[in-house]
Structure formats: structure tokens, C-alpha cells
Amino acid sequence: MMTTANAPQANRALKTKDTSQADTKLSALFAARHDEQNLQSPYDIGLIIVALALMTIGIIIVTSASMPVAERIHDNPFYFAIRHGIYIVGAIIAAMVVLELPMQFWRTANPYLLLAAIGLLVAVLLVGRTVNGSTRWLALGPITIQAAEPAKLFFFTYLAGYLVRRYEEVTENLKGFIKPLVVFFALAMLLLLQPDLGTVVVMFATTIGLLFLAGARLWQFFALVFAGVLAVVALIVFEEYRMKRVTSFLDPWADPFGAGYQLTQSLMAYGRGNWFGQGLGNSLQKLEFLPEAHTDFVMAILAEELGFVGVLAVLGLILWMVVRALQIGNKALLKSRPFEGYLAYSVGIWFSFQTAVNIGASAGILPTKGLTLPLVSYGGSSLIVMSVAVALLLRIDFELRVDGVQALGRGDNKRTSKAKAKPSAKSAAKPAVRTKHTNAEPFADAEADYNQAPDLKASDVNAPDMHESSEDAPVAKTKDAGSKKASNTVSPEDEGKAGIKAILARVSKEASSE
């Protein structure tokens, strides 16, 4: 026998064994849940590949588009390419850090992130750096930060948290619907003072989309859209440079060397691209004919060098990423994780709308706006923030996968414990021997015990243990009479009945004692 001193050690050994078995079982369940390609990583490999593919295309096109202007300004044709490569490394590091943060951090910290967004937008107005008439950058030594980029992400995390905390207010009364719009309008005013109408439009579209998905009433949704369109029109009409952009967008060839110059050069780049492009590095518009060729108009250079096929490939990758973000959001909502669902939805809407505005502006479909192409255009702030957004999608998907595996593990453990506890104490106490007696219909409650009882005869039954009736008295007398034969000799059929009753009486006694 085990001594008292050795008992704790034995218990610890058993716990260690159970833990190792649970870890092994969890790994097996995860392996069974995913195919062989995803077996090495619990993350969405497809999403990682698409994001890296867009970054790779981005550095190739940025290198090609920026060489002439980099040579003229910095005497180094690879100046912007090197910086963009550094930004990509920083973006990957930032994404890896965010990937280690649980979603609980974002759920609890989103109000503080909103305060950080407001602080950044106020700081850029006070000590920001002005470029081309816009004050949008904070200079931190050799690093410049475009404050609007992290402000977008921080606002979306706050909005997702608000929709979870105030879901009933948003869906049932106007007050809950208006509250997040007040926060949005405060941020919009700070952005318009820079000025940065493009970011305001993207944030507004994402806010509308999230409120609609959260269950806002339809009339509120349409009223908000109508009010937003009126506000944008008013902002355009009362600002002369914005009005010039709109008029040049409607007819850029009316002033091809003035207000419509940038758009006409971009359209010529698209026209020269044809189906398969002029070849990588063979663009003419990048020779400083097209301003901002490596930032806002990088898609025009890509279209000129890689043609319609190249544009279609980039659009396909971004579309896949957007659809995947919406799928992750829908999966999170179905698994009762609304914060993660709304945040994933916001990333999908954000990426899709910003892509549409960037390409629409460079193709003459929309007025020109200073918005980057996600993960492709030159710009450290945009690249890092959007990489962090992709990392959030990966983290949400990872936690959903882990939840699924743990649920499978819990279900398997329950089934195992039920299987172990299936034999009852009564059935374990009696030998599983087939009986010859089958006349047990009047005793349905004790049928299982009767079926596993051993064969007995009336001679094996003690009279005191039986609840005798007047009919059973001759049986007891026959037992006491020994070998003498009386006139009331018991038949074999009566012996069987007496044995059955004796067994059932014993079962009844055992049940009452328990």
C-alpha cells in the first residue's frame, strides 16, 4: 500500500500525466481540424501570403516609380526604395508584436486608444510639419508619423467596443445611435483642420457600415448617409481648391496643364498599359511627368508597366483580403464574440473603401484624394498601421480557431467520462450470468437486475427473506419436509416463480438500504 508521505508525489505525477495527455489530445484535435498545409501554424496562412504578396508588389512598383525623382532630389535612385524596405521590416515587426496581444487587450484599452487618437490629431495641429499646404505629419527625429493613420485604427477599435457595450441603445433609440457620431464629428473637425478630407470620408463610410451591421434602424442609416453626402458637398463647395479638383475631375482635358494636369498624366499612364503593359521599369509617366507617382498614383504606374493583367491581379489580392476580413467578422459574431466581429468588419470596409477611392481617383472616376493603396503605396505610417490591421485579423482568426479546438477537447473529455461512468454499481456488483427465468413482466423496474442474476431454485431461497402469501406457504413446508413427498408437492414451474420473487425481494431490500 502507498504511504501517506508518498501520496502527494503520486497525485502530482497523476496530474502531470493528465496534463501531458490533454496537451497531446489538443494537438491531435487541432491537427484533425486543419488540413496538412495549415498543420504547422494555427494562423491563416492564406491571409499572410496575400499580405506579403501585396508588400512585395508594392516595393517593386515603388522602386520603379521613384527612381527618377529620387535621383534628382537625393542623388540616389534607390533612396525611396531603401526607405520603403525599412518600412516593410518595421511593419512586419509591428504586426508580429500585435499578433502576440490577446484581443482582451483591445477590448479593455479601446477608450484609451481613442484618447490617444485625439491627442495625436491635436498635436499635429500644434507642432506638426506642413507639406504641400497640409499639416499632417509629426516629426520625431528622423521619423515622421502621419497622425491620421493610427487615428483611423484607434477610432475603429473604439467604435467596435461601443457597439458591444451599447448594443441595445444603438438598435432601440436615437440617443445610442448619435453618441458614436459625436465622437466621429469631433475627430472629423480635427482632420479637416489639417486639412484631410479623404481620411474623413473613409472613416465616415466605415462608421456607416458598422452601424448598419450592428442593427441600426434603416431610416437612421439613410438619414446618416444623406447628411454625410450633404456635408461633403458643402465642404467641397466652400473650399476653392476642392472645387477645382471636382471640376478638373469632371473634365480634366479642359485644363490639361493646370488643374487637370495630374489626372491627365495618370490617364495617359493607364492608356499606355494596354493588356500586358510596357514592361517592368519601362514607364514614361514616372519620369516626373506624373506627380506623386510612387505614393497616391502608384496604381497608374503599375497599370502602365504591367497592364490590365497586373491591375486585375492587385485588385484580386485586395478583394480576397477584404472578403476574408468579412468572413472572419461573420465567424466571430456567430461564435458570440461581437467586439472581434465588428473590428474585423471595420478593417474589411476600411480596406475596400480606401482601395476604391485610391484607384477611382487615379483612373478619373472620383476626385483626387490623398489616400494610399493598402500595403502597396509608399508611406511608412500607412504601411505599418495597415499591417497592424492585418495582424488583428490574424489574431481574431487565431483565437476563434483555438476556441473551436478547446470546445472539441471539452466535448471529447465529456464523452470519455460518460463512457467510463456508464456501468452502474448494481450491475458491477453482480456477475453477468444469463438466467433461465424470463417471467419478469410484472417487475419492470427490476428487469435489468433480474436479467443479470444467477440461476436459483426454490430450495436455495430462505423463507424468512421472502414476502410470503398464502399461496407460498406450501413451498416453505416442502423445503422443511426434506425428502418426504406430501400431497402438495411443488411443480418445477412453481419453483421458478418462487425463485423470481426471492430475487426481486433481495433487489428491493438492497435498493432501500442504499
UniProtKB/Swiss-Prot annotation:
Annotated gene: ftsW
Any one annotated GO CC term: cell division site
Main location: membrane
Family statement: Belongs to the SEDS family. FtsW subfamily.
This enzyme's EC code(s): 2.4.99.28
Name of protein: Probable peptidoglycan glycosyltransferase FtsW
Annotated stretches, region: Disordered: 411-437, 449-501
GO biological-process terms attached to the record: cell wall organization; FtsZ-dependent cytokinesis; peptidoglycan biosynthetic process; regulation of cell shape
Organism: Alteromonas naphthalenivorans
Pathway given in the UniProt record: Cell wall biogenesis; peptidoglycan biosynthesis
PROSITE patterns reported in the protein's UniProt record: FTSW_RODA_SPOVE
Class in the EC hierarchy, top level: transferase
Topology in membrane: Multi-pass membrane protein
GO MF annotations in UniProt: lipid-linked peptidoglycan transporter activity; peptidoglycan glycosyltransferase activity
Function, as annotated: Peptidoglycan polymerase that is essential for cell division.
PANTHER family: CELL CYCLE PROTEIN, PEPTIDOGLYCAN GLYCOSYLTRANSFERASE FTSW-RELATED
Cell location: Cell inner membrane
Pfam families: FTSW_RODA_SPOVE
